[in-house]
């Protein structure tokens, strides 16, 4: 406990069970001076960090991403802990005290040497990094340099969303924040009633005929390139005579560093019945023939890795690159033989998703009636669809979705909230004006223009735009508006609307950080509705393969979105992570299957009360999942496997390779652990 003039600073309330568990876990890892806490929104990360800060009893610098969050820290200190002297709290770098809460932006105005001087001069010994997932670019670089040169400083890192799915940045992130010491997961918060029970649903769509044609043409061109490679004698010879193949004993370091490429070479030669030494042939026994992802990885290695072994076929590689560029298979150094950017965009913006949104909204309204508070989140505004005319809607975006709903579900009231466009039902304008008045916005600063043929909706403009999100959110809550449509950019981190009970993610976002932030908007506890259960909908466009539909690029994004999210299985009383909570996507489907699955999703979404009960049944058997421990175990296990597979020409216990630091986590994570195809859908294409 920290004492303030002989008075004990203590938390005023009782810690929740998951907070007690986290504090016990943290106690084991304080010695390395890096404490890393990962906790879902609502877990009380701030309280945990303040407990540590007061226990350490030293001058502290707390870094936060926004002014609003800065004020929340001050509020937590003063309201939730006893015996805090307000005079010891500062929010200015120019006047540091014992407890200092500063924005990252304010710190970034100084260079590395100036920051070091500030820290030393003010005897700072603890630094807290709030919302640490923000620290992957310029801020990360600056702080990494500062911390590298300053010793004996404790770093406490807090986040709800580590960049698990971004291998390159995750390594940097862990380098700065340290390995994860304590993790509080969403199910624990539901169990303590800090988050509401919820369920994810997937609604399926199929490509248009034009999209099918576009994909097939692209695949035909990719097959031609693969066949060209398979029959190119200069490339075959270069691989067969590569040092990895003919002189493996003297190239163990390079083989382990490029282990996936080594395996691809073996598979390539094996597919051509080309003999290789029996020792290294044994390494390849368990691997299947070349797949699309193998060709993609190998093409990237050939074109963008400075491997002197392939300099002899430089002209051939130029020809390969030219062919790939011609079909649009290269994007920023990455190679995709199944899709290009244009096709990927077409699928994620599939026009069928507009009708899916209507179906979901109509279904949810029929179940909840006036209690429905549904948010549709999408990527783009598409202002060119703002006119209320009869023009065809063939894109996905805020305005196309708004127009499509108002045309087909006319009884529902909708509002639009983006940085540039605010639209509300005309009959809610008076409520809107009253809310503005309560926020000290004068009438002369508000412009209201009725729009549409029947003037049922009005476009709003405010001179003080900083309050618009707060005001529209309050309007959404207080009025009979059932649906709000907005962009990811605006309805993301920090948007607080606990009354929202349904979310449609009509976005192509796949990253764990962003998608988890958006999901978090819907699963917050509503104090005015203690029985709240939230439904979260994800839209997927499948891909046609012959007469059946299979997972494709759009599905890959949703699969990635689910990878680090624990939730309730669709029909079983158990909590699982990743997309395996659904039982329907482990095989190809016919069109009738798609309709059947969509109907099952709609039917299950109607059982909100049952979903809540099932959550608490599942929680009785729940064991918190610590992703860090899993990652550590995988790394060690796969290190040993690599050595084992490379025997007899290297021993895992040899002095040369005994130091675990010889191999970086990023190498192991990006090669061996994830060596298989990046999606199960790729297994449908073998050449």
Where are these regions (language model features)?
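Conserved RecA-like ASCE ATPase "motif II neighborhood" in helicase/translocase motors
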Residues: 100-128, 135-145
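Long, largely alpha-helical accessory region at the distal end of helicase-like NTP-driven motors
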Residues: 229-275, 552-687
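Conserved pre-motif I regulatory segment
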Residues: 2-38
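Post-DEXD/H (motif II) to motif III coupling segment of the RecA-like Helicase ATP-binding lobe
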Residues: 137-195
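Conserved C-terminal RecA-like helicase domain
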Residues: 40-43, 47, 82-88, 93-100, ...
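Walker A/P-loop
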Residues: 31-52
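Conserved RecA-like P-loop NTPase helicase motor core
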Residues: 388-391, 404-578
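Conserved helix-turn-beta segment of the N-terminal RecA-like "Helicase ATP-binding" lobe
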Residues: 60, 67-93, 174-177
């Amino acid at each position: 406990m920290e004492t303030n003039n002989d008075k004990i600073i203590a938390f005023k309330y009782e810690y929740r069970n998951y907070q007690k568990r986290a504090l016990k876990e943290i106690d084991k890892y304080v010695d390395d001076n890096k404490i890393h806490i990962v906790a879902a929104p609502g877990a009380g990360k701030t309280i945990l960090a303040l407990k540590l800060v007061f226990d350490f009893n030293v001058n502290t610098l707390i870094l936060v991403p926004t002014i609003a969050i800065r004020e929340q820290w001050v509020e937590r200190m003063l309201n939730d802990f006893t015996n805090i002297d307000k005079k010891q709290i500062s929010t200015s770098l120019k006047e540091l005290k014992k407890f200092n809460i500063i924005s990252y932006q304010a710190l970034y105005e100084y260079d590395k040497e100036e920051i070091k001087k500030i820290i030393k001069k003010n005897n700072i010994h603890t630094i807290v990094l709030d919302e640490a997932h923000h620290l992957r670019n310029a801020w990360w670089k600056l702080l990494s340099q500062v911390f590298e040169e300053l010793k004996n400083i404790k770093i406490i890192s807090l986040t709800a969303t580590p960049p698990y799915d971004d291998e390159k940045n995750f390594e940097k992130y862990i380098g700065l924040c340290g390995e994860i010491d304590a993790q509080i997961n969403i199910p624990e918060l539901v169990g303590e009633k800090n988050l509401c029970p919820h369920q994810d649903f997937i609604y399926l769509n199929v490509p248009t005929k034009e999209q099918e044609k576009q994909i097939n043409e692209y695949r035909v061109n990719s097959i031609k390139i693969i066949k060209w490679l398979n029959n190119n004698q200069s490339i075959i010879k270069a691989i067969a005579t590569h040092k990895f193949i003919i002189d493996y004993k003297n190239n163990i370091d390079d083989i382990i560093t490029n282990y996936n490429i080594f395996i691809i070479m073996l598979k390539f030669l094996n597919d051509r019945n080309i003999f290789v030494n029996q020792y290294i042939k044994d390494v390849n026994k368990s691997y299947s023939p070349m797949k699309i992802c193998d060709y993609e990885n190998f093409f990237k290695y050939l074109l963008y890795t400075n491997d002197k072994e392939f300099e002899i076929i430089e002209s051939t590689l130029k020809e390969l690159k030219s062919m790939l560029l011609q079909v649009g298979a290269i994007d920023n150094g990455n190679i995709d033989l199944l899709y290009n950017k244009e096709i990927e965009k077409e699928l994620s913006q599939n026009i069928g998703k507009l009708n899916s949104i209507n179906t979901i909204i109509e279904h949810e309204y029929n179940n909840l009636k006036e209690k429905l508070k549904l948010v549709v989140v999408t990527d783009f505004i598409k202002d060119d669809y703002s006119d209320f005319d009869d023009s065809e809607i063939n894109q996905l975006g805020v305005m196309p979705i708004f127009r499509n709903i108002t045309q087909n579900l006319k009884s529902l009231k909708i509002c639009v909230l983006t940085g540039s466009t605010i639209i509300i039902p005309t009959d809610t304008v008076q409520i809107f004006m009253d809310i503005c008045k309560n926020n000290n916005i004068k009438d002369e600063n508000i412009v209201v223009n009725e729009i549409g043929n029947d003037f049922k909706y009005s476009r709003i403009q405010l001179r003080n735009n900083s309050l618009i999100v707060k005001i529209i959110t309050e309007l959404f809550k207080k009025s009979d508006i059932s649906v709000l449509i907005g962009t990811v950019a605006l309805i993301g981190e920090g948007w607080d609307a606990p009354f929202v009970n349904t979310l449609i993610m009509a976005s192509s976002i796949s990253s764990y950080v962003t998608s988890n932030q958006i999901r978090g908007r819907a699963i917050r506890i509503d104090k005015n509705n203690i029985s709240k259960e939230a439904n979260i909908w994800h839209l997927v466009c499948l891909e046609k393969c012959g007469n059946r539909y299979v997972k494709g690029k759009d599905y890959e994004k949703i699969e990635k979105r689910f990878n680090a999210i624990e939730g309730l299985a669709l029909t079983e009383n158990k909590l699982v992570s990743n997309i395996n909570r659904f039982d329907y996507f482990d095989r190809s489907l016919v069109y009738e299957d798609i309709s059947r699955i969509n109907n099952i999703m709609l039917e299950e979404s109607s059982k909100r009360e049952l979903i809540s009960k099932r959550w608490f049944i599942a929680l009785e058997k729940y064991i918190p999942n610590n992703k860090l421990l899993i990652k550590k175990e995988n790394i060690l296990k796969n290190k040993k496997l690599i050595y084992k597979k490379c025997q007899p020409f290297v021993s895992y216990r040899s002095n040369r390779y005994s130091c675990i630091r010889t191999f970086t986590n990023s190498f192991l994570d990006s090669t061996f652990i994830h060596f298989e195809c990046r999606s199960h859908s790729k297994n449908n294409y073998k050449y």
